[in-house]
């Protein structure tokens, strides 16, 4: 069974109900053709680097699914090309083991970065406290000497 990640961009001028109907329709196209949908969610509305069909932004939707054959992929591809509501789409075959490794590496890198930030912040606070204490001592020595 092959695993896929599908990303498609929906026109930004669709209202919520029409967009929900579009997502439901295309999710059912996948499932009716033998795909098992693992996740189907909106990602974000993003600005494009260039205009696509006179639109400067679009709503990205991501679907992860698995399928025995390419029937669901081919049918989605065919109907997405016809639909005027989907500006662009891309289907990628995913190796789940490599994806899990990549997510684990990303999480570890994020954790290390957070630890380094916290350490730098603690060092900065300690240096400021030391500087403040020496300034107070200098001020106290100056005022007591008068």
Swiss-Prot record:
Biased composition (Basic and acidic residues): 113-124
Gene Ontology, cellular component aspect: cytoplasm; ribonucleoprotein complex; ribosome
Domain of life: Bacteria
Bias (Low complexity): 125-146
GO biological process, one term: translation
GO molecular-function terms, A-Z: small ribosomal subunit rRNA binding; structural constituent of ribosome
InterPro entries for the chain: Ribosomal_bS6 (IPR000529), Ribosomal_bS6_sf (IPR035980), Ribosomal_S6_plastid/chlpt (IPR020814), Transl_elong_EF1B/ribsomal_bS6 (IPR014717)
UniProt keyword list: Ribonucleoprotein, Ribosomal protein, RNA-binding, rRNA-binding
Disordered: region residues: 106-146
The protein's role, per its UniProt record: Binds together with bS18 to 16S ribosomal RNA.
NCBIfam families linked to this entry: S6 (TIGR00166)
Xref: HAMAP family: Ribosomal_bS6 (MF_00360)
Record-stated family: Belongs to the bacterial ribosomal protein bS6 family.
Name of the protein this chain belongs to: Small ribosomal subunit protein bS6
């Amino acid at each position: 069974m092959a695993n896929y990640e599908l990303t498609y961009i929906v026109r930004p001028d669709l209202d919520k109900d029409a967009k929900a109907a579009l997502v439901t329709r295309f999710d059912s196209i996948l499932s009716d053709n033998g795909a098992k949908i693992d996740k189907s969610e909106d990602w974000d509305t993003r600005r494009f680097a260039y205009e696509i069909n006179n639109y400067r932004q679009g709503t990205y939707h991501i679907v992860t699914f698995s399928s025995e054959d390419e029937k669901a992929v081919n049918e989605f591809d065919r109907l997405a090309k016809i639909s005027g509501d989907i500006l662009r789409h891309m289907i990628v075959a995913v190796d789940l083991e490599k994806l899990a490794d990549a997510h684990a590496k990303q999480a570890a890198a994020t954790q290390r970065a957070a630890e380094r930030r916290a350490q730098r912040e603690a060092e900065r606070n300690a240096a400021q406290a030391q500087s403040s204490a020496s300034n107070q001592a200098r001020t106290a020595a100056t005022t007591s000497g008068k």
